Amino acid sequence: MIEREYHTYLKLERGLSDNSIVAYKLDFNRLKTYMEEHQIDVVRATFDDLQAFVFETFKGIKSAKTQARLLSSIHSFYRFLLYHRYIEQDPSELLEMPRVEKHLPEVLSLEEIDAMIAQIDMSKPEGHRNRAIIEMLYGSGLRVSELTELRLSNIYRKEGYMRILGKGSKQRLVPISPVADEQFGYWLKDRSQLDIKPEASDIAFLNHYGRQLTRAMIFTIVKRLAEAAGIRKTISPHTLRHSFATHLLQNGADLRIIQQLLGLEYTVTTEIYT
């Protein structure tokens, strides 16, 4: 009962993305299993119980980010219990978060981005598609998940913008660059020649089987182009998004505008640009 309520709380009240909810569920199950093994009701756990769990669990977790997420999940569960009056005091309140070492993402120069684009074989059926993908990741700062879920019905080419469904199902409007729009127009013609599966009829980017592109496919496209261009940096679709924000900032854009374009809710997330 409480578990179902908690999952609903994560989705509807916290507005977390599906990926975040899956991670929080896994963390909760880990906590619940530990408490059951020690004959402790997870709802009635004390600070000492939680501290023992953290101490024991962290032995097998080397990543500070994973440790931080686990503690965040614990805090989230007990805040939920407190808010819904299952408990009178939050036993996780004094649990400390580990300091997460910040690693700045790689930034691509304009020359490097141009070099990647130059590697796209425009004679192939996927040429215009891949060019449009790079232009939208960099020119609009999309997350890879936002790109794979992009719908034709949310692209307003005449008006020059897209409606993006971001993390936590939050919507925002982002501009489409003239180059991205041009390449996307070419891709639409190629797309119309595919045997498009019914479930993918409104999906913007498809593979040659007429199915939705996956995040792994986008990663592969970006990585192969970077390697072909001789770029030795660690590159991912997020690198293009980060480069978009960095170049805007270097050219005098307001940090708050960049935050809105990226769909970042919390200022702390944009600290890497300050």
PLM regions and their residue ranges:
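Conserved catalytic core of the tyrosine transesterase superfamily
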Residues: 1-274
